[in-house]
Amino acid sequence: MYVKSIILEGFKSYAQRTEVNGFDPLFNAITGLNGSGKSNILDSICFLLGISNLSQVRASNLQDLVYKNGQAGITKASVSITFDNSDKKQSPLGFEAHDEITVTRQVVIGGRNKYLINGVNANNTRVQDLFCSVGLNVNNPHFLIMQGRITKVLNMKPPEILSMIEEAAGTRMYEYKKIAAQKTIEKKEAKLKEIKTILEEEITPTIQKLKEERSSYLEYQKVMREIEHLSRLYIAYQFLRAEDTKERSAGELKEMQDKIVNLQEVLSENEKKIKALNCEIEELERRKDKETGGKLKSLEDACAEAQRVNTKSQSAFDLKKKNLASEETKRKELQNSMAEDSKALAAKEKEVKKITDGLHGLQEASNKDAEALAAAQQHFNAVSAGLSSNEDGAEATLAGQMIACKNDISKAQTEAKQAQMKLKHAQQELKSKQAEVKKMDSGYKKDQDAFEAVKKAKEKLETEMKKLNYEENKEEKLLEKHRQLSRDINNLKGKHEALLAKFPNLQFAYKDPEKNWNRNSVKGLVASLINVKDNSTATALEVVAGERLYNVVVDTEVTAKKLLEKGELKRRYTIIPLNKISARCIAPETLRVAQNLVGPDNVHVALSLVDYKPELQKGMEFVFGTTFVCNNMDNAKKVAFDKRIMTRTVTLGGDVFDPHGTLSGGARSQAASILTKFQEVKDVQDELRTKENELRALEEELAGLKNVAEKYRQLKQQWEMKTEEGDLLQTKLQQSSYHKQQEELDALKKTIEESEETLKSTKEIQKKAEEKYEALENKMKNAEAEREKELKDAQKKLDCAKTKADASSKKMKEKQQEVEAITLELEELKREHASNEQQLDAVNEAIKAYEGQIEKMAAEVAKNKESVNKAQDELMKQKQIITAQDNIIKDKCAEVAKHNLQNNESQLKIKELDHSISKHKREADDAAAKVSKMLSDYDWINAEKHLFGQPNSAYDFKTNNPKEAGQRLQKLQEVKEKLGRNVNLRAMNVLTEAEERYNDLMKKKRIVENDKSKILATIEDLDQKKNQALNIAWQKVNKDFGSIFSTLLPGANAMLAPPEGQTVLDGLEFKVALGNTWKENLTELSGGQRSLVALSLILSMLLFKPAPIYILDEVDAALDLSHTQNIGQMLRTHFTHSQFIVVSLKEGMFNNANVLFKTKFVDGVSTVARFTQSQAGKIPKEAKSRGKEPN
């Protein structure tokens, strides 16, 4: 099968219908200039063969294949190729009856593309199968050697080279079919999974359930039979027990009534003894009251009075102390306020000064603008009057200005002559002085060098001093700061110890229980671990926590145990281990209810009012997490007793509302709360810790600074010595005659510079004056026009000056208002500061008065405490006397209590006996009623009563334990009730249907699995055959590959071999030998040699099961002419089994072709000419097409 003709229409550069006829069955060549359309003919063949990678035909999509992308009115591209099919050995499968096969492919812009085979529509798969069956697989196109294919073959990996062998062996189509079969197996596998899912998720569970239901039904029937049997046995036992109870109760009743009579007699005897003892006790009480009662009362009254006086004086004393503390707090607040006011006052004064300065600037600017406005007005008036302004702004006539210009010119000329004379004299003097200086001795130079050396030494010392980064006297300043910090730390330690002495409960000290003890495991007292967010809640939080405020928090229960056993604690402590404590917290829903009830600002969880470290969360929830804090009693009452809340609530004043029945409150101590006191201790601790850290840092800095300071002092001493040396040298230099001469020289040089500058400036002045004079002359000639121009300019300047003056005036007024406002604020701050000073004086006087009163009251309190102690001692002595008398009475009372106890026991026994009698009567009645009821309910009792309890009968209670039967019966009733709810009476029939469906699906599953195993077996068998065919193809191609390469490059050899450690089925790679040396890889070959390797492989592929058509696109591009000619001759003489269509630009190649097609452009129209070739030359036969130049 080979190409006979190609018809192109609308394809790429071929706009009109173009027929390319007369293809030779063996060797055809296409040539032409670049861009003439020769490769488009090959692209059309690839397009028709169904290529999917459009980049190989130089297009990004199918629309690019239409002439000018459809923008020239042509919207369809069509390619038709007629194949000669007369050789039936090479005929595609199914087309053996056709001598010619015409295949057409069309693509329409915006539409779909279609195939036609012999004029009949065909799908893409059918066309692919047609060409693949004759080895023309365009998507793996080893028959198509395009531009760059040589390079691609060289870059192929072993699997890709193997795929070329597979294509040649014809096993590639099998691979495609195999993949399709595997996909079918995957689909069947999905069906199998579906069947398996139905079996596992639907049918199998249903069968299992039905089997269970069948078992339940059978079990239900069994239970019913057993219940019936056990019911008769248990009822018979109950009947016998009821008859026995009725007969036994009568005898027991008589026995209990006799016991009651005996106990009543004992009660009467004890009552008589108790009466006699009570009389003796009353007599003793009367005697005791008579002797001691009056004195005891007077002592108790005296003690109470002393305590009242002491409490009153102590309360007054505490109140004074509280007032003193309040005044001190007020003084501190006033001092802080005054400090803040002073800062604000200073800032405000700076702001006033800044704004005032700004106002002055605006006033100056406004004044300047006003003056400018007046000058502009004056200038306008002068111009209106016929005057003109000169450069200085003064008004003058043109003639006057011209005279002034002449004067300026004359003056400049005079100054220039003077400067010239002065310059000449200075230059002469300089020349003579320089000659004198050269004659001076070299002593000055030596001193100058010494001075420069000292100066450099000083600079070096200064650089070294700067590198030390040391400030002078820094060490002394740090030492003074160290002394001040030490004093502050000592004062703070004393203050801290004094505060702890006042509040011993806030101290927690312990000894390390073991060596290397981690003190971080002991967190401290609860009071020390919290910070109160708002001091107004301190009292409430203290009430919430209660004694837990002094609990100790630790990390684990192990730490707690070690502290208690070996910590040598000074007093008893309760310890909270964070890892074991069970903490509860008020739920967020409860909090929302409470907030909705009284308002979100009036109720808070106590836990939210304190700050603490996150690691203490559980401990703090334990102490504060279960209580609300409200702002007043009304809200607290609402929250505590609301049925949705029912939670303990505390007011800010310390009143407690507990829904479980307790309410506490009333007047509380006026002293500051423990938490407030402890906050003062913590503040001192924090300040002390800060100062100690500062001291440590300062000591480290001093230690590091010591060496630096010593080094600095040494360098400073050296620098001072060099400075003194430099001063002496400088004085010596200044007093030398050379120095004086040098100063005169410098003065002369300065005079020369000034004279030259004066000459330059006078020339510029003279030039400007002359230019101005010339301009004024021109003005005189055009006086009227100049006057109008000056008038307009003057009007413009006047308007501009007026606008600017108005703006300046407005800004100044705004700034004045701002200054007045901020001045008022400053005065207000000053008045407030003065008021604070007055309040501070008043507070200081009040503090002084309170301190005096407290000193006096302290003595009175001490005296009252002594009186209380004395009264309590006298009262104690009197109570001891009374205690002795009380012991006698106590003995008598004990005897009375003994008799009362006996009576109580007797009465209790009587009540128990009465209860037992009632119980026996009730049991006898119940038993009789039960016997009657059972006889009426169960007819079989009368008939079988004589068998109850008899051996070897159905009612043998020894063989069948009735109690166990009753328990078993109860369990069976429960089982029956449970089974009765779930038992399915249709389970037997439904189970049969489900099992039939299960068997049917299992049968289908086995069929699918058998089909799958057969397909896999077939694939395995075909794989073996494929491997055999592939091995044969490899050996044949390998042999031809070496032979062709040796022909193209004499003395060389090549072969295809699997990579090391792999087989032929894994891939193949090139092995090349030049002479007797085998190369490791192709990179050791030249570019032309590598090209011959790739081309030899391609040609060897053509010798094995050749495709009917081969297309070569400029494969000789990288080869020289001798190799090209050899290739052409080889194709002509050795490859007579297939049709070759070759594109080439080299005569050595296309001269060997039987038919040559040449593409050209003539006047912008594309043409294709056909030539038949022989050794005599080329005879043009026909020109087939014309088309527009490709885009």
Curated annotation (Swiss-Prot):
The modification N6-acetyllysine is found at residues 114, 222, 677, 1158, 1160. One of its GO terms (cellular component) is nucleolus. GO terms for molecular function: ATP binding; ATP hydrolysis activity; chromatin binding; single-stranded DNA binding. InterPro entries: P-loop_NTPase, RecF/RecN/SMC_N, SMC, Smc2_ABC, SMC_hinge, SMC_hinge_sf. Pfam families: SMC_hinge, SMC_N. GO terms for biological process: cell division; kinetochore organization; meiotic chromosome condensation; meiotic chromosome segregation; mitotic chromosome condensation; positive regulation of chromosome condensation; positive regulation of chromosome segregation; positive regulation of chromosome separation. SMART domains: SMC_hinge. Residues 521-640 form the SMC hinge domain. Its main location: nucleus. Keywords: Acetylation, ATP-binding, Cell cycle, Cell division, Chromosome, Coiled coil, Cytoplasm, DNA condensation, Mitosis, Nucleotide-binding, Nucleus. Residues 173-507, 672-936, 963-1031 form a coiled coil. It comes from the Eukaryota. ATP binds at residues 32-39. It is found in: Nucleus; Cytoplasm; Chromosome. Belongs to the SMC family. SMC2 subfamily. Forms a heterodimer with SMC4. Component of the condensin complex, which contains the SMC2 and SMC4 heterodimer, and three non SMC subunits that probably regulate the complex: BRRN1/CAPH, CNAP1/CAPD2 and CAPG. The SMC hinge domain, which separates the large intramolecular coiled coil regions, allows the heterodimerization with SMC4, forming a V-shaped heterodimer. Central component of the condensin complex, a complex required for conversion of interphase chromatin into mitotic-like condense chromosomes. The condensin complex probably introduces positive supercoils into relaxed DNA in the presence of type I topoisomerases and converts nicked DNA into positive knotted forms in the presence of type II topoisomerases. PANTHER family: STRUCTURAL MAINTENANCE OF CHROMOSOMES PROTEIN 3. This is Structural maintenance of chromosomes protein 2.
